[in-house]
C-alpha cells in the first residue's frame, strides 16, 4: 500500500502545475488524504531514525503535505468565539473528552496543533504551535510560545523551552526536516532551523541559533562543524575570530559534554506530567 501511495504522490508532484482542488483525479485526492490522515495518527512520518544522528527523509511524504495545500480550498473555521480562514483544520477540533483522554495529550489554551501533526502520549502543549507534518514523541513538553515547524521531528522526553523555534521545511523549501532527538533540552528563545540535527541527550543553552551555515565549535577538539550537534553536547552561543582577529562572527560553542550537574539543572519535572 505504501509503495502504491508513493507512486501516486510522486506522479502527482510532477504534474502539480496542472492540479487544483477543482481539477485533480480522485486517486490523487484520496492518496493525499490518506497520507495526511496517517501523519495525523503517527502511522507515517516524514523522517525515520536509523541510529543516533542517522535519519532517512521520505521526500514523497513531504510532497504529499505540499500537495494538500494545492488541493484544498480555504474554509471558515471556528474555535469558540474565534474565527479562522485556512486550508488545514486543527488537530483536536472534532474530538470529544473521551477521545482527548485516550490520546494521552494535554493541551493548554490557546495551544494549536494542525491536523497532520502527531503528538504521542504524554506530550504537553503549553500555549504553543505545532505545524502539519511534525512528529512530537512521548513525554515531550512544548513550552509557552514555542513553535514546532512543518515536518519537524521531536524525540522522546524533550523540553522545548519558552519561545523556542524549531524550523519547518515547507517555506523556504528544505531538503530534510529539523530534528531534535530523545532527551534533549532546548533553552528559551533558541532557534534550530534548516534541517539541523540535535543528537540525543544534548543541552542547548538559552538564545542559541543553529542553521546550516552556523559554525559549531567544539572546545575539546578545536574543530568546527556544521548542521549537527553531537550526542551529549552542552552548547552555548559565542563567536569565533575572523580575518586575523579584526572581527568576530556568531558561532555555537560546544563547551562540554553533559554531566550529572547539567542533568540536575535541566531535569524534567514529573509533577507537571501527571
Curated annotation (Swiss-Prot):
GO terms for cellular component: cytoplasm. Its main location: cytoplasm. SUPFAM superfamilies: Trimeric LpxA-like enzymes (SSF51161). GO terms for molecular function: 2,3,4,5-tetrahydropyridine-2,6-dicarboxylate N-succinyltransferase activity; nucleotidyltransferase activity. Pathway: Amino-acid biosynthesis; L-lysine biosynthesis via DAP pathway; LL-2,6-diaminopimelate from (S)-tetrahydrodipicolinate (succinylase route): step 1/3. The keyword Iron does not apply. It is found in: Cytoplasm. The keyword Repeat applies. Homotrimer. This is 2,3,4,5-tetrahydropyridine-2,6-dicarboxylate N-succinyltransferase. It comes from Albidiferax ferrireducens (strain ATCC BAA-621 / DSM 15236 / T118) (Rhodoferax ferrireducens).
